[in-house]
């Protein structure tokens, strides 16, 4: 699933070419449209002024105050293509025809993602937790979030209502960087461990953005290029390989229904 760094990378790709005028919004599969606050025709002739991100959502702001909000689900791609390209790959469900002979395509084979046409985003995003790369996300905030929680720290990091944008890959990587086992009870972390985890989260996300995200199979950026952070992963997807710190074989276990990768020696 595309996580914060992957969506941030696509956002950055789009920001490079905006603003662009919408010529037509083409919905090729109705069930991919999760919410429609306004008619499609209201977008015709309007200008996409800005791309932004909230958690794992990508937001396109239109000059008449409307918003197009995308979530890429498990396998979604959002990329720019020249208008002259007439052959479409399978599972392209949304096409935004733009000026400058361009079009923006949303492709999603598994259809866990979608598009929301919204007049306001404040209510839509009101339940999302803090952005981990923001100044507001600090050790004090993380300490408040962890206080009294008996769940595994890995599960807490994946809770989008508490921290927005972190998924399985970056939770494992941040916990390894902080030296914390993914199955540790959240409330058991010391102040020093919380500080280390906060730094680890910010560092691993920033590094992944630098390398344009992680590609194992589906993910491509807004230019249809794979990310490169998979070449820099320390633990995720490296079961039974040597720990980069101590050399012991890395472990894998199921926590909250998801695979977690860690070092039994380096993480306590």
UniProtKB/Swiss-Prot annotation:
The keyword NAD does not apply. Coiled coil: none annotated. GO terms for molecular function: 8-oxo-7,8-dihydroguanine DNA N-glycosylase activity; class I DNA-(apurinic or apyrimidinic site) endonuclease activity; damaged DNA binding; zinc ion binding. The active site is at residues 2-3, 56, 258. Its EC number is 3.2.2.23, 4.2.99.18. SUPFAM superfamilies: Glucocorticoid receptor-like (DNA-binding domain), N-terminal domain of MutM-like DNA repair proteins, S13-like H2TH domain. Its cofactor is Zn(2+). Involved in base excision repair of DNA damaged by oxidation or by mutagenic agents. Acts as a DNA glycosylase that recognizes and removes damaged bases. Has a preference for oxidized purines, such as 7,8-dihydro-8-oxoguanine (8-oxoG). Has AP (apurinic/apyrimidinic) lyase activity and introduces nicks in the DNA strand. Cleaves the DNA backbone by beta-delta elimination to generate a single-strand break at the site of the removed base with both 3'- and 5'-phosphates. Belongs to the FPG family. This is Formamidopyrimidine-DNA glycosylase. It comes from Syntrophomonas wolfei subsp. wolfei (strain DSM 2245B / Goettingen). The gene is mutM.
